[in-house]
A protein has these predicted regions:
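Transmembrane alpha-helix interface/packing and boundary motifs in multi-pass membrane proteins
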Residues: 35-57, 65-67, 122-134
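Structural signature of hydrophobic alpha-helical transmembrane segments
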Residues: 24-31, 76-90, 139-141
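Individual transmembrane alpha-helices with interfacial aromatic-anchor signatures
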Residues: 168-185
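Selective recognition of hydrophobic, aromatic-rich stretches within alpha-helical transmembrane segments
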Residues: 49-56, 85, 131-155
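Small-residue-enriched transmembrane helix starts and helix-helix packing motifs
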Residues: 11, 15-44, 116-122
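Juxtamembrane boundary at the C-terminal end of a transmembrane helix
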Residues: 191-206
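C-terminal ends of transmembrane helices
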Residues: 37-45, 93-105, 157-158
């Protein structure tokens, strides 16, 4: 190419590059926003438990708008998934509002409950090592999360602080539902995103 000559770039190519960059920046922004919302939902479980599932749902909703350079959704978070988890979120929020104020503000045992739930979620995601059906993977993640929350709370009731709500005290299941239900829904919505991410990674890796 001779010096001084200019290269003609068609307007369509320039517009395509600008659009691609915008999509990339928007995808990064939405992913960061989604992560921050999930962090906020975990924080809310300790003091503002009523809004924790809502923050987790919004994080999942935001993630559904993430697209690749071609404009296609990165994760197949469809309207069926969003509608189902919206209903679950509304149910758990209403049940939390119906709890007495002292119970809603109580943080007793939340470290054990959340620790058990996160551990169960992580173990449930390991179902990819022996399961291939997506529905079975969802079920594995959900059951493992519920089991983790239950075992975490059961472990807490064996500590000196947890003895007043130990099994047989009359408060065990009531407190477990009051704290475990919002925690489960909050973690499971994160689990839905992680299941889809791992499933796509496995498909692309074949």
């Amino acid at each position: 190419m001779r010096e001084g000559m200019t290269v003609y770039i068609p307007p369509q190519a320039t517009l395509a590059r600008v659009r691609t960059k915008k999509l990339m920046y928007m995808a990064v922004f939405l992913i960061i926003l989604s992560v921050l919302l999930w962090i906020g939902s975990f924080w809310a479980l300790y003091g503002r438990q009523t809004i924790a599932p809502a923050l987790s749902y919004v994080a999942l909703l935001v993630l559904s708008f993430v697209t690749d350079r071609a404009g296609y959704s990165v994760l197949p978070i469809n309207s069926t998934i969003l509608t189902g988890w919206l209903c679950m979120t509304l149910v758990v929020m209403i049940s939390s509002v119906l709890q007495s104020e002292p119970v809603r503000r109580q943080t007793r045992g939340m470290t054990y409950i959340m620790g058990g739930g996160i551990t169960g979620l992580a173990l449930g995601l390991l179902g990819f090592t022996f399961l291939t059906d997506l529905s079975a993977l969802y079920a594995c993640m959900i059951l493992a999360t519920v089991a983790g929350i239950f075992l975490g709370f059961l472990l807490y009731t064996n500590t000196p602080d947890g003895r007043p709500i130990r099994p047989g005290s009359g408060n065990f299941f009531r407190y477990l539902l009051a704290k475990g239900f919002p925690t489960a829904i909050t973690l499971m919505q994160l689990g839905v995103a992680l299941v889809l991410v791992i499933a796509l990674y496995n498909i692309n890796g074949i």
